[in-house]
Amino acid sequence: MSQPPIGGAAPATAAASPAAAATEARLHPEGSSRKQQRAQSPARPRDSSLRQTIAATRSPVGAGTKLNSVRQQQLQQQQQQGNKTGSRTGPPASIRGGGGGAEKATPLAPKGAAPGAVQPVAGAEAAPAATLAALGGRRPGPPEEPPRELESVPSKLGEPPPLGEGGGGGGEGGGAGGGSGEREGGAPQPPPPRGWRGKGVRAQQRGGSGGEGASPSPSSSSAGKTPGTGSRNSGSGVAGGGSGGGGSYWKEGCLQSELIQFHLKKERAAAAAAAAQMHAKNGGGSSSRSSPVSGPPAVCETLAVASASPMAAAAEGPQQSAEGSASGGGMQAAAPPSSQPHPQQLQEQEEMQEEMEKLREENETLKNEIDELRTEMDEMRDTFFEEDACQLQEMRHELERANKNCRILQYRLRKAERKRLRYAQTGEIDGELLRSLEQDLKVAKDVSVRLHHELENVEEKRTTTEDENEKLRQQLIEVEIAKQALQNELEKMKELSLKRRGSKDLPKSEKKAQQTPTEEDNEDLKCQLQFVKEEAALMRKKMAKIDKEKDRFEHELQKYRSFYGDLDSPLPKGEAGGPPSTREAELKLRLRLVEEEANILGRKIVELEVENRGLKAELDDLRGDDFNGSANPLMREQSESLSELRQHLQLVEDETELLRRNVADLEEQNKRITAELNKYKYKSGGHDSARHHDNAKTEALQEELKAARLQINELSGKVMQLQYENRVLMSNMQRYDLASHLGIRGSPRDSDAESDAGKKESDDDSRPPHRKREGPIGGESDSEEVRNIRCLTPTRSFYPAPGPWPKSFSDRQQMKDIRSEAERLGKTIDRLIADTSTIITEARIYVANGDLFGLMDEEDDGSRIREHELLYRINAQMKAFRKELQTFIDRLEVPKSADDRGAEEPISVSQMFQPIILLILILVLFSSLSYTTIFKLVFLFTLFFVL
């Protein structure tokens, strides 16, 4: 049963609904809450004239006309008929206007209403539910199923419905099911884009462009029932303006419900869109046989209304009102006439809205947190990349440094390998390394010597402080002993005075007074015994210290014996050690300490003897007192205590005897150690030169010695020839001088003496060198041979007195010059003899110690012995030459007068002796064995020639 179109007969308020919806959208913007919305005063009329004019311009069909009462009655009858038939045929269609959204719903008349009663039409505010209940309106019979609304959704949700077409709806009491829903009016409007949720959509949902009529469903007759689902959309048509041309007023209930519906619709739109799409995909269009629904906003609104409050729908019965909305402002199903919602529904809606707001806030916070996490992740990634880049750069720098170090080490390694190969091929020794090592060794020796001196100083200070402490202790003990002795003497004087005064008739008090001194004596003896015990303990400690020192000295002596061997045994091969100066200093220091300790012990022994004598005297006195008063029982006790004291004194005497013996043993041991130290001093003095040579130097010295042997063999022959020539020249010179100037002739005795001297010299030359004595050691100055030669120089008395001297002054001056030059030459020869003798002794020591290095063979030993014999013969010839020179000087003796003491000028005789001196110097230099001795000799001879 189709319902006739009523678009032309709609009141003016229905035409004014789009403008009202737009105004309400401005009053209630998106996102505003119910608490912030302003309630308008009910006394102020709404601007209906302006809205009516706007709606009239938009509506093509009589928009400004009013429905008369007859028309309303016809509409009510038609609605009643539709309700009756709708229960049988299907859900009545809620008429929708297409295009611009001039959507109207047929108002449903409640059951039992008077036919002439005024019913709310499209655009008018819905009456409250209480008034409808008072009128006795009842709900229609069988409920309609909500899915029928969803079946009218078109296949394409975004397409607008065709102009003038109406879709079948699910509203109660609608027109005939499946009727043509075309309208007379309804200006077409373009549909909004998909997903657009602006103010226009909400305005179109409220009223559409042509006004949205609210189709009120009849409420239940009982006042306690809650309104159906259609009552939630009861305020959807409020924005339509006043009915007719009169000014309608706002009511508080309508405004509150409208605000609630506005916010609820706004919240449900998003959730309903997804459900609509799912229903559209699954199956739609079974009920929409006449025309498709105008777009996704209608489906969203329908689903939102259907699923908003299922509990309310179950409470009030199977009643539903269909609601739809066009895409361009579409049609909505009319709400029931009860516009006042129930308080429970309002509370549920508020709770749902609060939950939605909370969820939104949580979503916003989660979004913000996600954004922050993303930024943090980006920052962490950037920092990680930066750190990786920095680490990579550092690793590159470290790799470069390591490469540089490797190159440097490779260069050094190659250099060292080259040096090693060169040394292996040529056998050369790195002189620079040896010099650096020698320098380091010298520095280390200097530092060790300096530290040793400092240690000696500290040790001396320590010993001095210990001595002072011991002296102070001894003085303290002496003072204590003197104090005790004075006290004893005072007590003895008191006893004597009491004995002189006393008699047998003395009172008991005096007897007690006599007995007290003996007790005091006993106490004094006990104190003295305590002191003696302390002294004995001190002596024991010192004896323990001395025993430790003795053990240490014995251990060191054993070390020296194992290191150097006994005096009678030959030198060990592995001889080594520090310089003898440091060893001597250490031994001297230890010897000094032992001597000081021995002196201290001796003093203590003397003091103990004095104390023992004093104690013995006191004991004798006490014994006499014991014999005098033996009858008394107190004296018996005192005698027992005295016997104990005697035993202690006997023990102390035994300890003192023991200490005396120990001190005597220590003194003997110290003497023995000093004797051994002196022996080691003499022994170690001859081996200092050999310790400073290492294997490398010995090899070099052996090569130098081989070269020196050849030169010595060559020079020895030359020296012998030159000596012979010198003798001949000297004899000729002497004869010539004596014949020309002095006229002296040698006597046969002189010739015999000379021949005897020559024989002795030849005998000395033929003898082997004396190898018992090894030259000057320690404090000795020269060798015995040099001293004997100097002592055996002929005196002036052996030669006859010269004859008369020539009287000429020039001859006498020449003789003086010759004598002075001869004396100078004699001095130089003496020095050369002394130096050569020391060199020979050093060479002998080196030969004797050659086995230390294990480098001497039998052939080398024999060649060295021959070489030393040759040097010995040269030295003997020099001594013989010195003798001849002395005889010549004695023969040339001229008495010196005061007038002749002037400056001496050298003559040509010195030029004759200079080649001999140079040859001797060369011989000595090439026969030396160490660079230090060569340096010393060169320095001496240069100093001699300079002077």
UniProtKB/Swiss-Prot annotation:
The modification Phosphoserine is found at residues 569, 781. The chain crosses the membrane at residues 915-935. Residues 164-180, 237-248 have a biased composition (Gly residues). GO terms for biological process: regulation of autophagy. InterPro entries: MTCL1-3, SOGA_CC. Residues 1-251, 266-368, 496-524, 743-786 are annotated as: Disordered. It is found in: Membrane. Residues 342-726, 811-835 form a coiled coil. It is a single-pass membrane protein. One of its GO terms (cellular component) is membrane. Its main location: membrane. Keywords: Coiled coil, Membrane, Phosphoprotein, Signal, Transmembrane, Transmembrane helix. The keyword Coiled coil applies. Residues 141-151, 355-368, 496-513, 747-768 have a biased composition (Basic and acidic residues). Residues 1-21 form the signal peptide. Residues 9-24, 72-81, 109-137, 214-236, 287-297, 304-325 have a biased composition (Low complexity). Belongs to the MTCL family. PANTHER family: GIRDIN, PROTEIN SOGA3. This is Microtubule cross-linking factor 3. It comes from Homo sapiens (Human).
